[in-house]
Amino acid sequence: MSEQTKSVAKSISVLSIAGIICKLIGVLFSIPLNMISPQVATVFYIVYPTYTLLLTISSAGLPVAVSRLVAGFLAKSDKNNAWNTFRSAMIMLASIGGLFSLIMIVTNSLLVNMVGVEEASAGFYAIAPCVMIVCILSAFRGLMQGQQNMVPTAISQVIEQGGKVIISLPLAYLGLKRSVMAGAAGALLGITLSEIAALIYMFFCYRSKKPAFDSLPQNPENKPLSKKVLLRDLVVISVPITISACIVPFSQFIDSAMMIKRMLLAGLTSDQAKAAYGIFTSIVIRLINIPTALALAISMSLVPAIAACKARNDQAAVRKETDTGMRYAFLIGFPCSVGMSVLAGEIVRFFYGGVSKFSADQIQLASELLTFSAMTVVLFTAVQATSSILQGLQKQRIPMYTMIAGVSVKILLNYILIGTPGIHIHGGPYASIACYSVVMILNLAFVCKYAEMKMNWIDWIIRPGLAAAVMGAVVFLMHTLLPSNRLVTILEILIGIGVYLAAAFACKAITVDDLRSMIRRRAK
């Protein structure tokens, strides 16, 4: 295994561990927040989507663009243009972030009228500075990722999410003593303070790594590019990625406006439709998001690695990194999908079984939905990997078009299936599976075309799929023989991981080299 491939494997392992920790904290955060006050939690989750939408628009594509350009310049021994790219991106991100933060402050009353909750006013003020802070933070992350050093990004993500528990929950509790508005504002202010803590950490990482960056070689034949050219390149790369990142939230907005109405036509009462939609969004989607952290880890690692190979015109290395990325995508995605599907009921009860606001019937519905929704994990992981490979190959528009095609299928199927009696909310998982299947198939075709390689069916799909099937059979047998409780669920998951690794070794889906590379987490 080459040093470049080992670096990608190490990056994936570091970001995967951090991502899973962050997702688990995110799921667990909502439970104590609801215990402090359901009203505070309601206001929090009314304000938060507006923040995430503005954040996606302002900063989704630029960190990827920075990492790709920096990796490309460094591969050609051009540290000066790599540094100028970072500086240009920092100015752009700080300006855009500052503008969006100002918009949140100036349009506070308009936003409150839009959400229809007066208690949200202070919350919008509390989280407004966060947009600019995260934009600046993402510039530092892009620089580090461009050098293929994922440790600072991983640790800063844990700081962000840890702050939600350590800072947001106490502030929500203290604020609630005054009012619901103050409680929600306290929780949202905690998010801002958490991002400040993460930014401080990244700044110190940047300062400590700067001497090493300055000592990198500079090829005198590389001419400095103007700020205009660098800004143009950043925009050309980031805009399609940003649009792609906004497509899924846009489809979720359409779903929120359509799904309840379609369920009413399917024969459900208004209360039943609202409850079913709430179960799907607040339990199932939230649980599905936990393993998707692994997909994001793969995507962040692949973009700079592929871009560096592309910059050196090393097509053999491009094929090697593409093969490695896709193999890890399915190697991680298959067991997550199979495991979540087989243990859907146990997983739902593990997190939400003791939450009083959910009835036994609602927990059962969530379990049924998660059984099918779990299949989207392997598809989403493959979509993220293929999209990142295409972005690294300077084909960033293709994932945007394929995602539009997939989401169009999803919206159409949601409209048809959810409005069908006897299916209603169960159509949501089917539509999502169809969506990501379309995107994955299209992306794979383009990856094989532009990476100039053939689909590796055996290593990508057959071997990890077979290992996941063995794991699923063993876990299902345990599930039928053992009692259902949290301790047994943890035991089943741990044994499932062990069985999967053993089966993967047996069918050569994983090699000793793979395991060594993924365990090594030493920072560069």
Feature names for model-found ranges:
Residues M1-V27, N80, N84, E221-V248, ...:
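N-terminal membrane topogenesis motif
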Residues G72-A89, A276-A374:
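Specific pore-lining/lateral-gate transmembrane helices of multi-pass inner-membrane transport
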Residues F476-K524:
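Membrane-proximal transmembrane or re-entrant/amphipathic helices at the cytosolic face
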Residues L99-S121, S337-A360, L413-Y415, T420:
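Short membrane-interface helical motifs at transmembrane helix boundaries
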Residues C135-S156, M375-A405:
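Membrane-interface junctions at transmembrane-helix termini in multi-pass inner-membrane proteins
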